[in-house]
Regions:
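A conserved ligand/cofactor-binding region detector
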Residues: 1-375
């Protein structure tokens, strides 16, 4: 990668050709932005790998921050400043006749949050990386996290902000880390090969949760953590028949369509619950699987992870990790509960009764029968 202005200019012009098949002078400004963004992302790749290796090799304890929103804003300038390459890029682009500020304006605000809850989560991730701690975020990869305000015929209207329309240069899709999340169906008990009574979910609607990883770059310290965004795709397991496949696809699309669906209808309220479970189930399954791969055991997971739940939205993480440990990994109730009570933490944002979430028993028992049993 580049370490000076001359190397930067050479790399920038080369990438214009390799990415778009044309000289830099023929690239559109959005293409120039994408070239710069991918250069910055690739610049931190070695530090990203080193940070992961350090955690794995030293068996470090990690924080995983679950939040329905992360108001991270635009990342281009922040990432270049944290990497210490902003001035090199600015001067190199200027020599090429490109104003870096024009490229900065091409970046969309990430549609992952819209308020103080999301800004707090983003600040935590930024601070954790800059302090050199291994701490990561988990969120949904919303298609439309924001609304844009426009004036049409003299009136203010809100329209969806299609922030992913021109791609997100910071994310890397990781299909090999996909997990299966199950909704509906029924919980049944059975006897395993050791004669123990276990539970499992059957006849469920299965969704494949696919992660997209975004680097969270610490300030000039070579530490790079991860914000993992989950997207819903059709599962290869238990696909519905052609007659109901369209409804299945619609259900998948709804999961990641937007932040905080309208809860004035029953459908909207159930969708919120589905989103919340989708996030925590995908994130926890991924963490448990990674821990087993690194450590070869699960009885010490509470010594290696702490899961921070940002407000009430990810609270289903508590019964879900119980389900994962008991149903999928053979833990008894007391063993699982010991792990859970030593690795779950919660941030409360209000004590107003009307702002605290409550779900009808029928919603949880129908949508998540096994989780309902555990609760």
């Amino acid at each position: 990668m580049f370490t000076n202005k001359a190397d930067f200019k050479k790399e920038f012009k080369k990438r214009c050709v390799t990415k778009y098949g044309v000289d830099m002078s023929r690239c559109h400004i959005t293409e120039l932005y994408e070239v710069l963004g991918t250069m910055v992302r690739d610049y931190c790749a070695e530090d990203w790998k080193t940070s992961k290796d350090f955690v794995a090799n030293n068996h470090e304890k990690q924080l995983v921050y679950f939040s329905m929103e992360f108001l991270i804003g635009r990342l281009l300038v922040n990432n270049m400043q944290n990497l210490g390459i902003y001035q090199i890029a600015k001067e190199g682009l200027n020599d090429l006749g490109i104003d870096i500020h024009e490229l900065e304006e091409q970046e969309s605000d990430a549609g992952l949050g819209n308020g103080g809850l999301g800004r707090l989560a983003a600040c935590f991730l930024d601070s954790i990386a800059s302090l050199g701690y291994p701490g990561h975020g988990n969120c949904i990869r919303y298609e439309y996290g924001f609304f844009k305000q426009k004036i049409i015929n003299g009136r203010q209207v809100e329209v969806p902000d299609q922030w992913l329309q021109n791609t997100n240069v910071w994310e890397i899709k990781k299909p090999k880390h996909a997990v299966e999340v199950k909704f509906y169906g029924r919980a049944e008990t059975y006897q395993d090969v050791d004669g123990c009574i276990r539970s499992r979910t059957v006849d469920a609607m299965t969704v494949k949760a696919v992660p997209y990883d975004v680097p969270v770059i610490g300030y000039k310290n070579k530490v790079v953590n991860t914000l993992r965004l989950w997207s819903a795709e059709p599962s290869a397991e238990n696909l519905p028949s052609n007659q109901s496949f369209e409804q299945y696809l619609q259900a998948l699309k709804e999961l990641c369509h937007g932040l905080y669906p309208d809860d004035s209808t029953e459908h909207g309220r159930i969708l919120r619950l589905r989103q919340q479970y989708f996030l925590v189930s995908a994130g926890l399954q991924s963490m448990v699987r990674g821990h087993k791969r690194r450590e070869g055991r699960l009885d010490n997971i509470c010594d290696k992870f702490v899961f921070q739940l940002n407000d009430t939205h990810p609270i289903l993480a508590i019964p879900e990790i119980m389900r994962i440990l008991m149903d999928e990994n053979g833990f008894g109730w007391d063993e699982a509960w010991h792990q859970v009570t030593h690795m779950m933490a919660y941030t409360n944002h209000t004590i107003m009764a009307e702002a605290l979430e409550k779900w009808p028993v029928s919603y949880v028992s129908n949508l998540l029968p096994r989780v309902y049993m555990i609760i």
